A protein has these predicted regions:
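ATP-dependent carboxylate-amine ligase catalytic core
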Residues: 3, 7, 12-23, 47-139, ...
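Nucleotide phosphate-binding/pyrophosphate-handling subdomain across enzymes
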Residues: 119-124, 132-145, 150-153, 163, ...
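A conserved segment at the C-terminal end of the G1
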Residues: 25-29, 37-54
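Conserved catalytic-core segment of NTP-binding enzymes
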Residues: 127-201, 332-334
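Active-site-proximal loop/hinge segments that shape catalytic or ion-binding/gating pockets
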Residues: 410
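Beta-strand->loop->alpha-helix junctions that form or flank phosphate-binding loops
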Residues: 59, 179-185, 194-214, 230-233, ...
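Short glycine/serine- and small hydrophobic-enriched flexible loop segments
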Residues: 107-114, 245-252, 419
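C-terminal helical cap/extension that packs against the catalytic core
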Residues: 183-204, 288-294, 336-404
């Protein structure tokens, strides 16, 4: 089943399951870009001895179980299958017609309930107001976070920032005491969230929209110097400010008890594959040959703009090689126009079917090629439909002629390349 927003189906399924979501203590995150990063910062900082910190983020990067973690470790496959089979049986016997995402969301809630998580960090799948994760009662949400909002999924959420913001702000429901929003959002976005918070008596904290020497100031722990943390890209500073605003609220209200040193050390060890992620990609399982690449899941205009800022800072005007696949239905111009220059080369490819998301597939590379040529972004375009062949072909270019390689356009592309990489390492 494709994307179908609404809370009626999942509400009924959870009732048959005993409403596990009503026993969870939740931090709920919405936004267009940066949600997964904020969730990872939160779950990493909250981890303490004897604590179980659940995290639910989508889409998964490598395996579907990556979406559901406790202390950043995926749900065991057997446990996932057992819960999933029970849910599928309930879904069928009661003719509920739940979507794949609703079944996955229920799997996460049931798992977190069973292991008695102290905190559950929950990322919205799409939008917010009618997203399956919003079945969680407002009284169970200790805090909500709103990351940068941009144009994406317009056919579901609306064609303007204000319309999209209203959907995202829908996670702020009655009983939510505190909300944090990324201060770099457009004024009309912040106004929508501010009005929502005022109507529902949720106190709003707007993060600092300026870099200010890469510092984060908190009431609980004082200042943090972000220069000491492994953050790639300006936008990660603003994502971290959302997470820190939420954590600061929890600390002030004695919902957590974490020292400044603990916060710093846990942030220093955060890894987020697929977001400005540098790796030596193993392209050949026989020779163990590797190729340095930069991988980023940028898949919309605002994410592409942030990626370009990083690329110009790192590489200046140096020509780049892009390896790209794009999910079918995505707007091409907002994604490609900021990225490509006439000096750049692009290799267009595909990703395979995505586990648990049968409606997702890649845009035909020929369609993307025609668009790029029509727009005149670059004439250096190649198509390689077999993803596993793309990077080996680049490895045979001499180091003198080799350009920096940037893999982007879709998290599904990043995930599939990581699967190939991991299988080569195992072999």
């Amino acid at each position: 089943m494709a994307i179908e927003l609404g809370l009626s189906r999942i509400t009924k399924l959870l009732e048959h399951l005993g409403n596990p979501q009503n026993s969870l203590r939740v931090l709920h995150i919405a936004g267009t870009n940066g949600k997964g990063s904020v969730c990872t910062y939160l779950s990493s900082v909250l981890q303490q001895k004897s604590c179980q910190i659940g995290k639910f983020t989508t889409p998964h990067l490598v395996h579907v179980t990556d979406s559901i973690t406790i202390n950043n470790k995926p749900i065991p496959l057997e446990r996932y299958r057992n819960i999933r089979l029970k849910l599928e049986a309930l879904n069928k016997s009661h003719s509920l017609k739940c979507t794949e995402f609703e079944l996955l969301t229920c799997t996460a809630f049931k798992y977190f309930y069973d292991v008695q998580c102290q905190w559950c960090v929950i990322e919205v799948g799409l939008g917010g107001r009618l997203d399956a994760t919003n079945v969680i009662p407002g009284a169970n949400k200790a805090c909500c976070g709103i990351t940068k909002i941009g144009l994406d999924h317009e056919s579901f959420l609306g064609n303007t920032l204000s319309e999209i913001s209203k959907e995202k702000a829908g996670i702020i429901t009655k009983g939510v005491p505190f909300t944090v929003i990324d201060g770099t959002n457009e004024p009309n976005v912040i106004k929508v969230v501010k009005d929502r918070c005022k109507a529902l008596e949720s106190k709003l904290f707007i993060t600092d929209p300026q870099l200010n020497g890469n510092m984060i100031d908190t009431k609980s722990w004082g200042c943090f110097d972000l220069a000491k943390l492994p953050l790639n890209g300006e936008y990660q500073i603003f994502n971290l400010r959302v997470a820190m605003g939420m954590l600061d609220y929890l600390q002030i209200n004695e919902l957590i008890n974490i020292t400044k040193n603990e916060v710093s050390s846990r942030l220093a060890n955060v890894e987020w594959p697929g977001r400005l992620y540098r790796m030596d990609y193993c392209y050949d399982k026989l020779s163990n040959g590797t190729l340095p690449i930069l991988m980023d899941g940028a898949h919309n205009g605002s994410a592409a703009t942030e990626l370009v800022k990083y690329l110009r800072k790192e590489y200046g005007n140096q020509p780049l090689t892009f390896v790209m696949a794009v999910t079918y239905g995505k707007s091409l111009e907002p994604l490609l126009q900021p990225l490509l220059r006439p000096v750049d080369r692009i290799i267009l490819t595909r990703f395979n079917n995505v586990e648990g998301m049968p409606w997702i597939h890649a845009t035909d590379p020929e369609e993307i090629k025609d668009f790029i040529l029509t727009q005149g972004y670059t004439s250096e375009i190649e198509i390689e439909n077999e993803l596993h062949q793309v990077l080996p072909s680049l490895a045979h270019v001499s180091k003198e002629q080799r350009r920096p390689i940037v893999v982007c356009g879709s998290l599904y592309l990043c995930g599939e390349l990581l699967r190939i990489h991991n299988s080569h390492l195992r072999n």
